Amino acid sequence: MPNNNLTSNQLLAKDYLEELDFIDISKSDTKDLLLMSKQFTINKSSVEIITEISHNFPLKYPKFYTTDTTMFLKYPHIEQHNHRISGHRLCLDADEDKLYYENPSDLLYDSYNRLEGFLNKIENNEFDKNEIFDEFDSYWCKTTGIVHFNKELIQKFKSFKVIDSYIIKTEDKELLFIEDEKYIEQFCKSANYNFIKNKIVYINFERELEKNIPRTYSELKSLIQKLGYLSSLQKIKKAKNILPVILFSIFIPGNKETHYAAMYFDEIKSTNVVNFINPFLSDSNSNKVFYGMPAMNISNSRLYKRGGNLMNVNVHKKRKKIAIVGCGSVGAALAHKLVKVGCNNLLLIDPETLSSDNIARHLLGMEYLEQNKAIALKRYLGKQFLDIEISAVDEYVEDVLNDLKDCDLIITALGSDANHIEEKIIRDAINKNSAPVISCWFEATACIGHGILFDSTCDSKVFNMNKLFNEIMLLDEKATSMFVKSDVGCNSNYMPYTYLNANLHLNHFANMVTKYLMDEKIKNHWVSVGEIGSLDKYLKSDLKVEDNTLIKRDF
């Protein structure tokens, strides 16, 4: 049925394809899509190819589908069956290789040539037999669910294994995890989620899929029998809480890496069926098809590598314990950045509760109002990763100084220049009575940020904290007194500051901390300069700051 709602570019494509002997097979339920079909002869067999032209063509490239199901899993670049089109998509264009075409006809010409080239390679048997594994997940995965697994737990299993799995129920979906139970509990407690413990079957297929990739129950059963695991599967056919999923691993040909994916069995439980295994083993279901399911490695070594580089992985491997004294706008945001770069063992200390006055510049939002900052921050950070160790103390640091003794680094993040408690912590570091300290604070309106490392290299005999802080400040005292505000009440003074300025400095603080954790030799004093604006008149007489300048210097 011809589609009467086509755009001018779709009509152009229709005329172009008709000249190539395609015919219009658009359906009423395909709405704004143009579907064109043509029969090609491949290896003496007639194969239907369907072309899909979107209403966004040429911004969306033409898509090609084959209705020949025997081509799937036999040749590369052919994806799972698309029920909307009733065919398997031919993936001929990588997103990173796509160009913008000013002339839609040029795109049609190039796309059709790529299609012919692909079909010719099939005709001439030019595809490497192992090429299908290079993009395994692209065509294997069919379901929307994902198995999130920790590879470090799985890789020790060499054959067949029934392992613990967990379904975490979020507000709008259920997530499947294979991870240490203590981390599941910790994550769910932080996120206020519930979880259900189940079992899942894991099979190591080794190199067997190189010879034949199964599609049906009978093909998979034959493969499992060949590997000697069929009896193991039969033993658990009456076991409860077995998910209808098989996680499996294979060796990618020509690659030393082990790849993981999963299979989903669409078996509805009945009173007579305990799990999916009985229907799977039944001869009456031999031609039934299971669904490919993606499996994602969530081990921290993988996540940190994807989220940055090997530095993140190495920071995580150090597993150094970091205390953050002060979980206000500076400490909370810095803790978040450090967790994201691999610091997974934090001690958070702050006696205060989160006030609405701080919401605009604090990492935590309205959800955490009137909660202790350290405990609320622990909950927030606990939702970022599974394998993370965070403890929170809702007391004044002077009352819990002993808690700092087993830390590898102490960060004081009080947001402004030091007080007498911070001086005590710093002097302990200088005198080797505690771990080194990095003090992080801002000058007026957060236009300037300071990160200072205090350790045993500092001379305790000449150390004078107030003198030091006054010397390294870039603004004179007038700037501080000019911008300090006061609310009603005792100890109600505060310094307003620009969020964007603060975030700039926090990135430098995190960079400084990371380099220190990696045992790099760093300068003791880092200064970052944000938007100075009208405050340039308060710069000390011997200083001049250009826009976007980062200053690093020792003291």
Predicted regions and their residues:
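Glycine-rich phosphate/adenylate-binding loop
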Residues: 141-282, 405-409, 413-555
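N-terminal charged helix/coil linker that caps or initiates catalytic domains
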Residues: 266-322
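Glycine-rich phosphate-binding loop and adjoining beta1-alpha1-beta2 segment
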Residues: 353-385
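Conserved SAM/SAH-binding loop
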Residues: 394-400
